[in-house]
Design a protein with these regions (language model features):
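Rossmann-like NAD(P)(H) cofactor-binding subdomain of soluble oxidoreductases
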Residues: 1-46
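Short, flexible, solvent-exposed loop/turn segments with mixed acidic/basic and small polar residues
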Residues: 47-52, 149
Length: 202
């Protein structure tokens, strides 16, 4: 193929910085900035498995900067991978992904740290931790190197999402301390609505 037909696709978790870095590149129109919302807590070639992308979403950012022919070819690839395609600008992508992905990974890492700091005897963790704990800290098994890089690259949005999360945790703590358990239950009921949202996604 000629250079004009070459497709370069980025699959990283952040989009704004890489889109800025190539904005003036002579072959920018051959570039696809995408983020497949798929994966597991495992990394490396050994973690690959068939059907990983089936019915998963892939977000393409700043698509208007890509040539129509290149975009069409990329869409053909994604559709053959059985993925659902959506579009978003790179700045908005990084803002929202900080809340729905990066914050959950950060929380998983820090929950794991909190428990390990308190429970020096690993046997206590093994004997007492149930499926809820296991599912919540599952993401803490992810690659530390990769996630340190992600937290660095999207630090402004992650700090904002973390500030919001800490405010909610402090409010939750205050409700317990002040014994406002009716208000706490109401808060839990409102938050429980997220299961309907996630059911619609899945």
């Amino acid at each position: 193929k000629s250079v004009d037909d070459t497709i370069v696709i980025d699959f990283g978790s952040t989009k704004s910085s890489i889109c800025k870095s190539v904005i003036n590149h002579k072959n920018r129109s051959n570039f696809i900035a995408s983020h497949p919302i798929a994966g597991t807590e495992y990394s490396g070639p050994h973690a690959a498995h068939f059907g990983l992308f089936d019915n998963k979403n892939v977000i393409i950012c700043d698509y208007k900067k890509t040539k129509t022919k290149i975009l069409d070819n990329a869409l053909e690839i994604f559709l053959k991978m059985k993925m659902n395609v959506s579009y978003m600008d790179s700045v908005s992508h990084d803002k929202h992904i900080a809340y729905v992905s990066h914050l959950s990974h950060l929380s998983s890492f820090m929950l794991g740290k909190t428990v390990m700091d308190e429970e020096k005897n690993e046997k206590n963790i093994f004997n007492m931790a149930g499926s809820g704990f296991e599912s919540t800290v599952r993401l803490a098994k992810s690659s530390p190197k990769m996630w340190a890089d992600i937290f660095d690259d999207n630090k402004i949005n992650i700090i904002k999402s973390l500030d919001d999360y800490i405010k909610n945790l402090e409010f939750f703590k205050l409700l317990i301390e002040s014994k406002k358990f009716d208000e706490l239950e109401l808060l839990l009921n409102k938050t429980n609505y997220i299961k309907k949202i996630l059911k619609g996604i899945n």
